[in-house]
Regions:
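Short, highly charged C-terminal tails/helix-capping segments
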Residues: 245-259
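Amphipathic alpha-helical effector-binding/dimerization core
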Residues: 59-157
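Extended hydrophobic
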Residues: 165-238, 242, 258
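Short amphipathic alpha-helical signal-transduction/dimerization elements
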Residues: 18, 139, 143, 147, ...
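Short, structured helix-loop boundary elements
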Residues: 3-7, 26, 64, 77, ...
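Short amphipathic alpha-helical/adjacent loop interface patches that line ligand
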Residues: 33, 44, 67, 88, ...
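N-terminal helix-turn-helix
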Residues: 1-77, 81, 240-245
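A structural signal for short hydrophobic beta-strand segments in well-ordered beta-sheet cores
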Residues: 53-54, 101-102, 203
Length: 259
């Protein structure tokens, strides 16, 4: 590992924490990472403020709660993909159109999985890629059932115009989210990419929170989003049930419902 850069030094120190013992002294971490004690101490101090490491009264260090939180996020993401993949494959076989699975990450959607067929057309989406949530079917499906603060943060960041059909007016955007809450599905009519439309539905977890969304996308003129509503809703409901979701547990945030 290149330890001449700040990032290299950080990762070298993080790699020094091993599973063979619960905590390490500064001298042990310095030796294991190959970094001087002064450098190790400085990085550890920064990690402490970030909750990346904890220092005991005896001066020994162990990994902090922040890494457990981040690990949980990755585990949740992998879990959702694992559960959703068979249903995505069924949708692909049935529709022969592109199928997406995505999560909300800040004001963007982060694509976890994408399945394509031989007749799928080009799309701006890719696995691990990001697109502004407000312009996508999956993003709007999640936002419609998210807390008012989450929706406000997306609007405050600005509603981008990826195409002439993107919704950039906050009032119109809130009205769109209200319709999605009523219908249970979201549509993207060339809002993210010209020539493409889609239908999407949210995936809820055991608390009734929208943790992801799934969509079927295809070219305008070939894909009929309305005809795919039963299929996409059945797929997302099935995934949600695997995550512990019970339909009666779903609640729409009061402030969002009155937007």
């Amino acid at each position: 590992m290149d330890t001449t850069t700040a990032a290299g030094k950080l990762f070298a120190l993080l790699d020094a924490f091993g599973p063979e013992q619960p905590d390490f002294s500064l001298a042990e971490l310095s030796m294991r990472s190959g970094l001087p004690k002064s450098t190790s101490h400085r990085i550890l101090a920064v990690l402490q403020t970030w909750r990346g490491v904890e220092r005991s009264v005896s001066g020994r260090y162990r990994q902090g709660i922040k890494f457990f939180e981040l690990g949980g996020l990755v585990q949740d993401r992998l879990r959702i993909r694992e559960v959703a993949l068979p249903y995505m494959e069924d949708l692909l076989a049935t529709t022969r159109e592109m199928v997406h699975l995505a999560k909300l990450d800040g004001t963007d959607v982060l694509y976890i999985e994408r399945l394509v067929s031989h007749r799928s057309v080009r799309s701006p989406s890719r696995v691990a890629g990001r697109v502004p949530a407000a312009c996508t079917g999956v993003g709007k499906a999640i936002l419609a059932f998210s807390s008012p603060d989450v929706v406000k943060s997306v609007i405050a960041a600005g509603l981008p115009a990826l195409t002439p059909y993107s919704i950039t007016n906050p009032v119109q955007f809130l009205e769109t989210l209200e319709r999605i809450r009523v219908l249970g599905v979201s549509y993207d009519s060339e809002e993210a990419s010209l020539g493409l439309n889609c239908v999407a539905a949210p995936i809820f977890n055991h608390t009734g929170a929208p943790v992801a969304a799934m969509s079927v996308s295809g070219p305008v003129g070939r894909l009929s989003p309305e005809a795919l509503v039963p299929a996409i809703r059945a797929a997302t409901l099935a995934v949600g049930r695997h995550l512990g979701y019970q339909p009666k547990a779903m609640t729409v945030p009061a402030a969002a419902a009155s937007s």
